[in-house]
Amino acid sequence: MVNVIKLRKGLNINLKGKAARQKFSSGKCAQYALVPDDFVGMTPKVVVREGDTVKVGDALFVNKKQTDVKFASPVSGVVSAVVRGDRRKVLRVVVDADKEQQYVDFGQKQVASLDGDAVVKALLDAGLFGYINQLPYAVSTTPDRKPRAIFVSALRDMPLAGDFEFELDGNERDFQTGLSALAKVAKTYLGIGAQQTNAALTGAKDVEVTVFDGACPAGNVGVQVNNIAPVNKGEVVWTVDPTAVIFFGRLFNTGKVDLRRLVAVAGSEINEPAYTEALVGQPISSLVESKLAKTEHVRLINGNPLTGRKCTAADFVGGHTSEITAIPEGDDVDEMLGWILPRTNDFSVSRSYFSWLFGKKKEYSLDARVKGGERHMIMSGEYDKVLPMDIYGEYLIKAIIAGDIDRMEQLGIYEVAPEDFALAEFVDSSKLELQHIVRQGLDMLRKENA
């Protein structure tokens, strides 16, 4: 019997520009780049030089602290640049792609005949292991500690997020192979949404399926971990993006690294929002250049509007990116009387505007403005209304700001990731950058416990 967990807290933000279940072609590109910052908590050591020839699956850089964790090139070709920033920080490794792609053959493997160590070794050798994250700290993991459990969330419910069921179509076999491989390492939990009906999800084998019924952020893997089996101090669990599970399955089924994924190009500033097949590291310009309604006063986001990163068309599809979104920047708006003027087209959690009368199906075109400056933190219970976790969000944020490590541990910082506070940041009257604050707290704890 499938376990069903109903979440009463949360908030759905219905934005204009959801991607239709249609595909468009973004074509092949001359250059691709792998960006180390996509793999949080990992310090890269570049293992190629400009002019080197690489195949798909060859390592471009490794984790400096654990060099057996490699990061594979998404394309074959010639390394054209290793771009560095301040203090020689590696920003990206750029590869000029071949017209005909060549692959490293890692050999097909029958997952049923492998044990957990063999699965981990295969992922390490192919440069895919770094796509696995961990709690605590919400960073790219390393193989030196065996996880207590592995969690996969197939529910993407952030505003304008890509529909994983649409991406799963045609990849069911690889997805199941990836799940079976992870189950060899540790007990694996698959979280799905109450509205998801794909048999590859509802009938997934070798894993424990849990249905989450509730508003955003029910799809956050951290929320699911907290509601299924919370993380205690000293424990480690792995969290895996469902697309990465497909990557793993392709490796075992074909013996090759294949980083193709379906990316939603969405937002109110996109003409005919839809999906396109793209590679990790593909230039964002190839996805949006024919889709942008205008080129000025637009905020491009590598990810969704709540947890994604501000980017430009010259940036590249991230390692965990399932959508590229475009919303109004808001820097050309001049509103008479500001928020005081009654209106019907603005979203309000507190029902300050009359837009709530139009029901939950009304779509909004929100821009990137914060609409207010940072101010003193008010203990109002705002966070708890949109945070379906067994933690005291406001008290945890205060402990992080104060740098009180003991208090942070007591309040459950080991269970959270920055994205878990995305909605709290959206509704916060104090205009605090909560995700950034949580990231600072996690980095502080990680350094303290190193």
Which ranges hold each PLM region?
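N-terminal, Lys/Arg-enriched amphipathic/low-complexity engagement segments
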Residues: 1-47, 62, 212
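Exposed loop/turn and edge beta-strand positions of beta-sandwich/beta-sheet ligand-binding modules
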Residues: 42, 73, 89
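Short, well-structured beta-strand-loop connectors
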Residues: 48-62, 81
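Short coil-to-beta-strand transition motifs
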Residues: 68-76
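Buried, small/hydrophobic-residue-enriched core segments of structured protein domains
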Residues: 69, 83-286, 290-450
